[in-house]
Amino acid sequence: MVSWKGIYFILFLFAGSFFGSIFMLGPILPLMFINLSWYRWISSRLVATWLTLPVALLETMFGVRVVITGDAFVPGERSVIIMNHRTRVDWMFLWNCLMRYSYLRVEKICLKSSLKSVPGFGWAMQVAAFIFIHRKWKDDKSHFEDMIDYFCAIHEPLQLLIFPEGTDLTENNKARSNDFAEKNGLQKYEYVLHPRTTGFTFVVDRLREGKNLDAVHDITVAYPYNIPQTEKHLLLGDFPKEIHFHVQRYPADSLPTSKEDLQLWCHRRWEEKEERLRSFYQGEKNFHFTGQSTVPPCKSELRVLVVKLLSIVYWALFCSAMCLLIYLYSPVRWYFIISIVFFVLQERIFGGLEIIELACYRFLHKHPHLNSKKNE
């Protein structure tokens, strides 16, 4: 049964992303055609203000407890984040970790392309220059090249989240993963899926070539009690009681240099995840970490609490104010309608705002294709 908590959570997030896209991100879009550096600097910070909202709601309103062990992030460092894909919404729960240990404004996510069409959420993700993929390497490789080369060219300090497993852990997906393991003489997994390493190795190599990689962060996520597998579970009010993250930081210069060794390195991390998660779920449901973190959290819990409270207050007032302005003033209503039409049409015609941003960079810097010099 749908719960009021779930409805409140989804509607609040939708309203924030919808009105935020139109009234906060919409006015800065022309800056894309004038100064891309300023556009990216401003848009990243505006989007990050919304990313604090689900963190605030989950922890402050619904009592979700977050436990983080292991390493943190060097402030401002550029990294690739690899994580097991336990549920379809792990990418959102990760914000609870990054809000404490890193900066939300530098995160980029590889997501399935259908999400960019979702009103509000998808529009903001396009402005944030998330990387949308079709999960077919022959279709995704060129887009990966363009986006990563663009980030390297503008010296964007990104932290790129990749799910090497490619999909979330369900019984059907686990059966397919184990069939693959049996055919290839590999270990069968219970708590993770076998990773697909092609995209991971490509991204790491490309970022290293562009001198835009400081580390790889290997994050293991676990849910000791209830596991909200899909967005539907959130709508039903099935929020996780606890989310545990274990972070391991690997400096870029410690990674293997060859593609084959990097693939093997990734597979070893997943073998470790399987054992770590087995100990977690069959034991005390904690990640046992006896060593010391090499990097401490960059924010205190008091600072995080203040940000969460301010986020809820700001977005509640902002959404209410925008509704009032739309009701009272016809110019605002016209702007509202025109903006919606623009966001819908630009995606259908051009493929998304991140594609337009790439085209602007090519035009302003006279680069017909960002990857033309590196293509095989």
UniProtKB/Swiss-Prot annotation:
It is a multi-pass membrane protein. It catalyses: a 1-acyl-sn-glycero-3-phosphate + an acyl-CoA = a 1,2-diacyl-sn-glycero-3-phosphate + CoA; a 1-acyl-sn-glycero-3-phospho-(1D-myo-inositol) + an acyl-CoA = a 1,2-diacyl-sn-glycero-3-phospho-(1D-myo-inositol) + CoA; 1-acyl-sn-glycero-3-phospho-(1'-sn-glycerol) + an acyl-CoA = a 1,2-diacyl-sn-glycero-3-phospho-(1'-sn-glycerol) + CoA; 1-hexadecanoyl-sn-glycero-3-phosphate + (9Z)-octadecenoyl-CoA = 1-hexadecanoyl-2-(9Z-octadecenoyl)-sn-glycero-3-phosphate + CoA. GO terms for cellular component: cytosol; endoplasmic reticulum; endoplasmic reticulum membrane. It is found in: Endoplasmic reticulum membrane. Pfam families: Acyltransf_C, Acyltransferase. The chain crosses the membrane at residues 9-29, 48-68, 309-329, 336-356. Widely expressed with highest expression in heart, liver and 12.5 dpc aorta-gonad-mesonephros and lower levels in the 16 dpc fetal liver and adult bone marrow. In bone marrow, highest levels are found in B-cells compared with whole bone marrow, T-cells, erythrocytes, and granulocytes. The keyword RNA-binding does not apply. One of its GO terms (molecular function) is 1-acylglycerol-3-phosphate O-acyltransferase activity. One of its GO terms (biological process) is CDP-diacylglycerol biosynthetic process. InterPro entries: Acyltransf_C, Plipid/glycerol_acylTrfase. CDD domains: LPLAT_LCLAT1-like. Pathway: Phospholipid metabolism; CDP-diacylglycerol biosynthesis; CDP-diacylglycerol from sn-glycerol 3-phosphate: step 2/3. Glycans are attached at residue 35. Its EC number is 2.3.1.-, 2.3.1.51. A motif (HXXXXD motif) lies at residues 85-90. This is Lysocardiolipin acyltransferase 1. It comes from Mus musculus (Mouse). The lineage of its organism: Eukaryota, Metazoa, Chordata, Craniata, Vertebrata.
